[in-house]
C-alpha cells in the first residue's frame, strides 16, 4: 500500500513538472515568434506617421522595393485579394542574433481604408486559401481592424503574401461611402538595424567612438570583439564593443578617425513602402451603366434595321 502511494506521488510530481515546463515554454516562446508585429505595435499607436512614412523604416534603415496589387474596383461585402510582393536575392544570407548566417525572413503591414478588414475564414474561397498557405494575420490594434500585420515568416516561401480582404457595405456602415480609397503597404526583408529602445542590433555598422590608434583587439569567446583605442588628444583608452556578426575592418596598431567604420555593413535586407487605389463600386451604378450600354446597342440595332427598311422602300419605289 505504501509502495502504491509513493508511486502515485512520483507520477503526480512528474505530471506537474511536465505541465509547468510546457506552460513556461509557451509563455517564453510566444513573444519571440511574434517579434516583428510586437515591435511596431508596442511603440506606435499608428504605423503610418502624419508625413506618410511607415514606422517600420525607423528600425529597417535600408531602402528596398515593395509592390502591392489590388483590384481596380470591388463591390460591397465582397472578398478580394491584396497581393504584396517583397523581392530580394534568394542567395543572400543575413546575420542572425547569435552572429551566424541564416535565411532572410519577411514581414508586412497593410493599411486599409476604414471599414475594410480581414475576411472571415468562412468567406475565403479554396483558391485564396491555397495562396495564403499557413500565414497568420493579426490586427495592429483590436480597434483597428483595417490595419493588418504579418511576419516574420520565411522569405523563401512567402516572397509573395496574399491578404484576404472583405470590403464594407455602405448600406450597413453609414461612415463608409462609394468612393476611391488609398491603400498603403510596408514590407521588410531581413532583420532591422535599430531596436525599439534606439540601441543597435548586430546587423549594423559599428564606428569608432574616438580618434587615435588601435592598441588592442580581443576576440571574445562567444564571438565579437573588444577594441581598445588610445585617444589621440588625451591618451585615454576607449573601449568599443563589437557584437558577433559584423566583420572587423581594422587591426592593431592602425590609426583611425572618429566615426570611422570598424566593421563591414552586414545588412542585406531593408524596408520599402508603397500604395495603391481601390474603388468601392455602387452596384446600382454598375447596373445603370450596363443598362445604358444595352440601350445604346439596342438603339444602334434599331437604327440599322430602320435604315434597311427605308432602303427597301426606296428600292421598291424606283422599281415601280
Curated annotation (Swiss-Prot):
Q: Does the keyword Thylakoid apply?
A: yes
Q: Which InterPro entries match?
A: Cyt-f_TM (IPR024058), Cyt_f (IPR002325), Cyt_f_lg_dom (IPR024094), Cyt_f_lg_dom_sf (IPR036826), Rudment_hybrid_motif (IPR011054)
Q: Name one GO cellular component term.
A: chloroplast thylakoid membrane
> Annotated Gene Ontology MF terms?
electron transfer activity; heme binding; iron ion binding
Q: Transmembrane stretches, by residue range?
A: 286-305
Q: Where in the cell is it found?
A: Plastid, Chloroplast thylakoid membrane
Which terms under GO biological process does the entry name? photosynthesis
Write down the required cofactor(s). Answer: heme
Q: List the disulfide bonds.
A: none
Q: What residue range is the signal peptide?
A: 1-35
Q: How does it sit in the membrane?
A: Single-pass membrane protein
Which Pfam families does its entry note?
Answer: Apocytochr_F_C, Apocytochr_F_N
Q: What is the purpose of this protein?
A: Component of the cytochrome b6-f complex, which mediates electron transfer between photosystem II (PSII) and photosystem I (PSI), cyclic electron flow around PSI, and state transitions.
Q: How does it assemble?
A: The 4 large subunits of the cytochrome b6-f complex are cytochrome b6, subunit IV (17 kDa polypeptide, petD), cytochrome f and the Rieske protein, while the 4 small subunits are PetG, PetL, PetM and PetN. The complex functions as a dimer.
Which named protein is this?
Cytochrome f
Organism encoding this protein: Glycine max
